[in-house]
A protein has these predicted regions:
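Contiguous, well-folded functional domains in the mature portion of proteins
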Residues: 1-156
Length: 156
């Protein structure tokens, strides 16, 4: 199965990282892909795979430039933990508000079933989305422009 991009934008980072502490995943290692959305990108965010929303966790914070790495830990953000319906693996999506964006909109609920590409929310202008996953081959590249719900990020 494939993971599609959760956001329109530019891939700025692909690295191995520990999971978000807010979801008690700091002892697990994931592949993290960061997608920066500039003011001209569509800011609707989509589910990278079919699955069930297991957890949503909102964290207030600062409004630093979202292209900075520290924004994923300091800025206002919203976490989604999705259990992939095929692999059973957890996929984490993090919406990160930026310097201009001061509003994160969540459009799903815990326990909701999603199809790949379904709308999960949006962020207002100049923000970032991180996706964390395991056990997949990375298909995307740093510097690549991606489209939410369409561009392939990773595969089994």
């Amino acid at each position: 199965s494939f993971l599609v991009s959760p956001a329109d934008g530019l891939i700025t980072d692909i690295s191995d990282r520990t999971g978000p502490i807010e979801l008690q995943l700091e002892n697990k290692t994931y592949t993290k892909v960061s997608i920066f959305m500039n003011v001209f990108n569509c800011h609707v965010n989509r589910s990278p795979s079919s699955g069930t929303v297991e957890e949503i966790n909102y964290k207030p914070g600062k409004f630093l430039n979202a292209s900075l790495d520290k924004s994923s830990e300091e800025n206002e953000r919203n976490y989604y933990k999705i259990k992939d319906s095929k692999s059973g693996e957890e996929i984490i999506i993090v919406q990160i508000a930026g310097l201009i964006a001061r509003r994160i909109v969540c459009q799903v609920e815990q326990g909701q079933s999603l199809k790949q590409g379904d709308r999960i929310g949006m962020i207002r202008f100049g923000s970032r989305v991180d996706i964390y996953f395991k056990n997949k081959k990375i298909l995307a590249k740093i510097g690549q422009n991606v489209t939410a719900g369409e561009s392939l990020i990773a595969s089994d």
